[in-house]
């Protein structure tokens, strides 16, 4: 598996299995003397139709609250792993797309993401892991997560 990786990106989802993904990424980073970065993408949801204009501010407030909560969680996790603040990203968008975009922008050569075993290829990998695997321009390690 080791291929002299220089920059590893953890795609964190804060699930109960995030520790497994982070642990695997940290092991690989230590083995390869690689820089470690981490990101969390808050899944964007469409704003309410303009016919329901009063709901738009609620949607924006909810998105802002989710982003703020994500930033706090990511900072705590990244700090515990010794990941520099300039190597942490929390954004709102499409997880599969934005993980790949961040990896490209930061010249990452390995993305580490969790995968859930559920059903079909999407169920085997999970929709985010599936999107990352199929669109990344670098290696992807899908860490198999045990279902509780």
Regions inferred by a protein language model and the residue ranges of each:
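Short, hinge-like loop/turn segments at secondary-structure boundaries
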Residues: 53-57, 105-106, 129-130
